[in-house]
Amino acid sequence: NSRLDTLQAAVLNIKIKSLSKWISNRKKVANNYLDLLEKNSFIHLPKIDSENVSHSWNQFVIKLKNYNYDINNDYSELFETDVNKNNSLRNLLKLRLSEKGINSIIYYPIPIHAQIAYKNKNFSREKLINTERVCTEVLSLPMYPEISYEEQVYVAENLNIILKSCINELQICA
């Protein structure tokens, strides 16, 4: 259980006044990314399907098809994020982006049913195929309220160029 002490509560009390502004800025950042990346057919962008839904955009997650995915793969290689051990499009793109100074993150690389604590629970992998596939395909781009439009353009332009290069390197046909 986590409890706030007096100091943490005081800091939160000040920060909470800025929350609406931060979320508003994140929405602008997300809309910029959506506009900058919408023409790239290799990227699946996040979508909001309802006007009644409000997204906080804590993360901006793109999805890249994993052409190496095979349900028969062992967990140890399937969810590996090191490009030297699993040369997937997502992992290679992450490496190449970092070489350009662009930090991208794989937040949830291993689904719960594949984690050691659940090893003996006998989950049916066939019933969780979408979960497994998504865990091997998602990548989060830099997302924070203060990111400038110019920085986003840099991220998007490099992502588009690097992604084409990765597709050629991996000899992926659309």
For each predicted feature, which ranges?
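PLP-dependent aminotransferase class I/II
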Residues: 1-174
